[in-house]
Amino acid sequence: LFQKKINFHNLGYIIIDEQHKFGVKQRKNLSDKGGNNCDVLLMSATPIPRTLIMSIYGDMDISIIREKPKNRKEVITYSKLESKIKDVINFVKKEIDNGNQIFWVCPLIEESKKVDHESAVKKYKYLNEIFPNTVDIIHSNIDKYKKEEILSKFLNKKFSILVSTTIIEVGIDFPNANVIIIENANKFGLSQLHQLRGRVGRGHKQASCILMFKSNLSENARKRINILKNSNDGFVISEEDMKLRGFGDLLGFKQSGLKNYKLADPIHNADLFKLGEMEILRIEKEEKNINRYKSLLKLYDQADIINDII
């Protein structure tokens, strides 16, 4: 769809689901195919910082659906040192005894000499020794038909634990899966962790997410884990993500990055920006004599206004 050689006849409406999966340039290339009369709807459980700040600046209208589907409970999120894996195994045993299923997510398929991350294959072998005949594995190197077979078996409760890479991040719906364990959680971004956590809690039972980490956590990684533990709201998580990572370049293609402001900061003064947007709309609709704002507009055009104020 993004390729130049693909043209549309009278493209008028574009819906982009999981918008954080696409780059700024990709989204722009697609919307350009519709011209000036094309409407674009972006959908995501966790908007990227750049999208969030555009809504604050008034460049994008935003609708928030905060209600969960009926009978769904909040996912309880825990954090656990990887050295305490025996506690996690005991928890998993109880969940299996209660008829529940588990996702176990690892960042890599195979072990890497360069990166000290837990691999899915290694974890599969480890869990298969503890829970024989109740574990299977899925990752991107498995062919399409085998993946479908494994997922079908998991859906029909043929086994209890599915070890996986982040391939399950989107498009997976298994109501009986009530636990997700994420290895090396400190290596994932907030949006990805929230998306992975969303794979559980789709039934009526209480669901749990366990974020496993090594002892040498960075300050930002510790903040990310605490944010996930304290909130299930994707919009709140996106706001916190924006505070940590910044929002990038609004006029370019960078989707994150911190900016310095001498006056109002759109991250910490979001309410002020919204108030300003509402006032601009009111002036456009109600004010007939724009001349009363000449002095203000003149100040705005002066390059040294900020230095003068400070």
Q: PLM features: residue spans?
A:
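Accessory helical-bundle/CTD segments and flexible terminal tails appended to RecA-like ATPase motors
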Residues: 152-161, 168-175, 180-183, 198, ...
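Inter-lobe coupling/hinge segments of SF2-like helicase ATPases
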Residues: 1-226
